[in-house]
Design a protein with these regions (language model features):
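Hydrophobic, Leu/Ile/Phe/Ala-enriched alpha-helical segments that form helix-helix packing faces
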Residues: 5, 80-88, 162, 166
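Short, flexible loop/turn elements at secondary-structure junctions
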Residues: 23-26, 106, 118-120
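Acidic-basic catalytic patches of nuclease active cores, encompassing PD-(D/E)XK
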Residues: 12, 48-96
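Active-site beta-strand-loop-beta-strand hairpin of nuclease catalytic cores
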Residues: 103-113, 122
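Catalytic cores of nucleic-acid endonucleases
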Residues: 116-170
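Nuclease-adjacent, charged terminal/linker segments that flank catalytic cores
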Residues: 1-52
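Non-catalytic C-terminal interaction segments of nucleic acid-processing enzymes
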Residues: 3-4, 160-203
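A short, well-structured beta->alpha microelement
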Residues: 91-100, 120, 124-131, 172-186
């Protein structure tokens, strides 16, 4: 257990602050902020406006890689689950032994399969999709790679780059890459359509 703990956690550095975006520890080298996620460094408050952490022996934080590549994607997955449940859908995390991230079941029985991705660079996600397409044999009516909205700030064509890769490498795939905002709109719209169809059947 101690080995696992030491591989996942490290002491909190002196003069650390709570990152207002991801909740990890933000440090400063001069005026330059440092965090595990580059998107956290955009439009940050002044150092004096951040919440300082009082250092004491025994204070721990997740290591950079664990926070960046495990915790942050997990936050996105939980956000997708929350959106689905708010729409009245069932949401199962990590179905089929974590084959993908979220299985959403709509009120009419439709299944949507979601893989949440936090790659800041679309070409990294493109390569990941080409090397490891997770939706092979997945039984679902719709399939999505969902990325945070701020990924499109630096790369407005982010989703197009990934969708072009899907069309080229997996022409029979129904998967598509969308931002969280677009995914939320599509899910809410589909749920409303389901409700309308059910109402029309009863009329």
């Amino acid at each position: 257990i101690n080995k696992i703990f030491s591989e996942a956690y490290e002491n909190v550095p002196n003069w650390s602050y709570v990152c207002p975006k991801c909740g990890w520890t933000m440090t400063f080298y001069g005026a330059q902020a440092q965090c595990c996620n580059k998107s956290c460094l955009k439009n940050i408050p002044k150092k004096d406006d951040l919440k300082p952490l009082r250092f004491q022996d025994g204070n721990w934080r997740l290591r950079h890689g664990v926070m960046r590549y495990m915790c942050l994607p997990g936050q996105l997955e939980l956000k997708i689950q929350k959106i689905a449940e708010k729409c009245g859908c069932g949401a199962e995390l990590w179905p089929d032994r974590d084959k993908y991230d979220v299985k959403i079941t709509l009120p009419d029985g439709q299944v949507w399969a979601i893989d949440a991705k936090t790659h800041r660079n679309p070409y990294m996600l493109k390569k990941s999709i080409e090397n490891d397409y997770v939706f092979t044999h997945t039984k679902a009516q719709k399939v999505f790679y969902v990325v945070p909205d701020d990924c499109l700030t630096d790369y407005p064509d982010y989703c197009k780059i990934c969708n072009d890769a899907l069309a080229s490498s997996f022409p029979d795939s129904i998967a598509k890459c969308v931002s969280m905002r677009i995914f939320s709109i599509e899910l809410k719209g589909e749920v409303e359509d389901v409700k309308l169809r059910n109402y029309q059947k009863k009329s």
